[in-house]
Amino acid sequence: MLVLGSLRSALSCSSTASLISKRNPCYPYGILCRTLSQSVKLWQENTSKDDSSLNITPRLLKIIPNDTDIVTLEKQDELIKRRRKLSKEVTQMKRLKPVSPGLRWYRSPIYPYLYKGRPVRALTVVRKKHGGRNNSGKITVRHQGGGHRNRTRLIDFNRWEGGAQTVQRIEYDPGRSSHIALLKHNTTGELSYIIACDGLRPGDVVESFRRGIPQTLLNEMGGKVDPAILSVKTTQRGNCLPISMIPIGTIIHNVGITPVGPGKFCRSAGTYARVLAKLPEKKKAIVRLQSGEHRYVSLEAVATIGVVSNIDHQNRSLGKAGRSRWLGIRPTVRGVAMNKCDHPHGGGRGKSKSNKLSMSPWGQLAKGYKTRRGKNQNRMKVKDRPRGKDARL
């Protein structure tokens, strides 16, 4: 930085000397006047050449940053402005003219930033639909079948590739409730899809620190790891890093379980987890999941900063049964509407399950029945999710 100032207008020798002598009687008035006048003359001789060459009046106090500083400051200002704008942004719901019941009750969130074209074909594959049936033709997953043809997007849940990556666009994915982001590596130019976090927009730069701290970041910190600077640089929205590098209390998503595995938890729309504690002696961390359950994960497991995008997915209304069929979801028949041979609630005169407890088609109790007992308990679970009146909404 080049700092230019003026002592001509700011320092009037007589007034300044009188002010100093009044506050400090030990300094004589005459000596102060001579000293100040000499300093002003020396300053004028030294700065007259610089002022004439730069065409800057000495009365003006200006700070002229370097080109690199200007670029950095502009980027920071743009980022802050965009975050303020996003914080005030309210998602509008799409409503259609109520010509029919299916249009009357249809609600869908509007996201103007979504890309309207086709996905990158090299990052998609064709997956044949099986209608919820296994290799022997038996239904193993109910309520599946039909639906519109689509290609499965290949999502990078591991994020092993380091270096800065720029978000090209945010896309709709028919295979999941969240949105996805197309990334382009700034060095190699390689394309990849990741789960988009809330607030991620085209032009943003994200980075993965799963393989460690890059040398460029170490050089910025002076060759030594400064925890404060490292936390500010790495814990940005959309960045992927080990849980050992994430501060306690940070909101994360796409949380892994093992040191080398992909992200497993909190991948659907609007979900997130929170880092509660780190236990270096056990090489584990405690994470609170979306359900409220506290769970152990590896301290070197992967996680991404932020909340999963498409938070208003829960507020949508399909409006009619046909839209569920377009999504590949078949109807769910009530047990009391079935025959006795098909469901424990079936049969009888009228639609009543009699005095039986609610249960599944295979006789398993549906309300309050614990399915894990004894040695089959999950050892990684620290605290069970809240139930009943304490359940999370």
From Swiss-Prot:
GN (gene name): RML2
Protein's cellular compartments: Mitochondrion
Assembly information from the UniProt record: Component of the mitochondrial large ribosomal subunit (mt-LSU). Mature yeast 74S mitochondrial ribosomes consist of a small (37S) and a large (54S) subunit. The 37S small subunit contains a 15S ribosomal RNA (15S mt-rRNA) and 34 different proteins. The 54S large subunit contains a 21S rRNA (21S mt-rRNA) and 46 different proteins. uL2m has a Na/K ligand binding site.
Protein name per the record: Large ribosomal subunit protein uL2m
Gene Ontology cellular component terms for the protein in this record: mitochondrial inner membrane; mitochondrial large ribosomal subunit; mitochondrion
Additional free-text comment from the UniProt record: Present with 1600 molecules/cell in log phase SD medium.
UniProt keyword DNA repair present: no
Domain of life: Eukaryota
